[in-house]
Amino acid sequence: MKKVELQAHRGVESEYPQNTMVSFRAAAEQGYERIELDPRVTKDGQFVVLHDRKINSTARNPDGSPIGKELLISDLTYAEALEYDFGIWFSPEFRGEKLPLFRDVLTLAAEKGVSLKIDNKLFEMKPEERYAFYGLVRATGADVVISCVTEAHADEVNALLPEAEVSFDGLCDNEMLKRLNAVFGRDRLTVWVPIERRMAEWAPTDWFASPEKAAAILPFAKLGIWAIGSVDSFHEACRLYHPDAAETSGNIKPSDAMES
C-alpha cells in the first residue's frame, strides 16, 4: 500500500495540551509530517494559535483556577493573554505553557522540517487581517496548507499564496472537484472526508467516506481521512479508500502509517 502522510491535529493533543508549542514540538519529534493548527488574532493584531474564540476552555489563571469571566481572544492584547496559563488545564506538568505566537510556530516548523495545515478559522478573520496573515507566510517562505470550505476561500488562497496547497474540508460534488482541479491540479489539492460517525456526529451523512466517494475524489485530488478512532480503523480505512493523508489527535503514530 502507499505511504499515508500523517498530520497531527493541534499537535499531539492526546498527550499534550492542544495548540501549544510543547504539543507542536512533540509532533515534529515523533515524526508527523504536518501539524494542524487554529489561527486567531489578538486585539493588538498578533497572530496566535487557539481553537476557540474564547480562551476559557484551555486557559487558566496562573494558580490553575478557572477564569471567572468569559474572555474573547479578540478583546485581549497578546501581553494580556500571556497573563494566563495554557497548559495546566491538561495536566499540572504543563504548568507555565503560554499561548503561542503563530510566527514562533513557523520558526519551529522550519527548524524541524514539517509543514503546517492552517485551519479554516483563518476565514473568520477580517479581510485585512487575513491579508496580513498571508504576508507573514510569504515573508517566511513557510510550507503551509490552507483549509477551505468554499471555492471563494480557495480562490483567495490561490491568488495570495499561489504556492500553497489547499485542503478542502467542505462538501464537494464532482463538478466542484473538476473546477478545483482545474485551478490547483491534483498535487496542490486534498479533499478531506470523515470516517467514524461517533467522532464527527455533527457532520452531514453524505460527507462520510465510502469506496464510491473515494473513487470519485482520487482522480482529481488527494484524499484525506479524519475522525479515526483507532489504529485498526485507520488500517481498514486505508484498505477501503486508499487515502494520501490522515489526521490524528495522536492515537495513530507515524510507525502505524508506515505499516498501512
Q: Where in this protein do the model-derived segments appear?
A:
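Phosphate-group recognition and catalysis centered on beta-loop-alpha active-site segments
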Residues: 1-260
